[in-house]
Amino acid sequence: MPARTISSLTEPDRGHAIHGLVRWAIWSVLEQAEDAVTLVCRLRPQQGWEWSLDLSVTYALTASGLIVTPCARNVGTAAAPFGFGAHPYLSVGEDRVDEVEVAIPAASLLEVDDRLLPVGLAAVDDTDHDFREPRLLGELTLDTAYTDVVADADGCWRVTLAHPHTGRVVTLWADATAYPWLQVFTGDSLPLPARRASGIAVEPMTCPPDAFNTGDDLLVLAPGQEFAAPWGITPG
C-alpha cells in the first residue's frame, strides 16, 4: 500500500487551520420554541486542544430581525484560550454583490502574507478598502479583517448592504466591545462558481486570525468563567 500523509489542517494548501474547532461538530437541541432555538456542544480535549468548554448558541427571531447569542463556559480546571467568530453570508437579492452598496465603519485593516497570516495593521485611509462612507463594492475582492470599528450610540457597530435600485437593505450588528474585529469575504475564491460573489460574508469576531499564536485580543477564560455576547441581522 502506498504511503499516505494525514493532516488535521483544515487549510492544507496554506499550511494552517481555518474556521475553528466546532464547524463540523455535532450540536444538540437544548431548547426550542416557535421563534427561537438553543443548540449546545461540549468541546473536549483533542489533538492540538487540551481544554473543556461547554458551548451554546441561541438563535431568536424578533420583530427587528435575528439575534444570535453564543456562549462559552470553561468547565475545565485550567485557564482556556478562546476566540469566537461567526460566518453569516448577507445578500439583498439575486444580483451579484459587486452591484451592492456596502458600508463598513472600520478605520483599520489587517495586512496579511500570501498564506493569509497577519503581518500588521494598516489604516484604510485613501485605499479601496475604505467603506466608512457607503459605496458600490464593484470588482473589489475582499477577504479582509477590519478593526478600529466605530460603534453607534447603543454600543454596536453595523455593516450595511444596500441595493441601489430595489431599496433592499440588510444590516449586521454586533456588540463593539465583545467583537472588536470583523472579517469581510466576497466569496470570489469559493470552489463552486455559482456561489462566488452571490453574497458577502460579514463575520463578527472577538479576535483576529492567528490570535492563538499572536495573543492579539485573545480571550482567556478562567475555570468557571463564561463568555456571552450577542450579534444579529436586521432587514431594512
Label the predicted regions.
Residues 6, 12-15, 233-236:
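Short, charged beta-turn/beta-strand-edge "cap" motif at the junction between a beta-strand
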Residues 9-63:
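Extended, loop-rich substrate-binding clefts of extracytoplasmic carbohydrate-active enzymes
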Residues 43-88, 93:
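Acidic, contiguous internal or C-terminal segments within carbohydrate-active enzymes
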Residues 30-37, 60-65, 94, 165, ...:
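A short, structured loop/turn motif at beta-sheet edges
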Residues 168-236:
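Active-site pocket scaffolds in enzymes
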Residues 1-2, 222:
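Residue-level recognition of short, solvent-exposed, well-ordered loop/turn junctions
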Residues 73-77, 164, 236:
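Short solvent-exposed strand-capping/beta-turn motif centered on an Asx-Ser/Thr pair
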Residues 89-177:
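Active-site/ligand-binding surface loops and adjacent short beta/alpha elements
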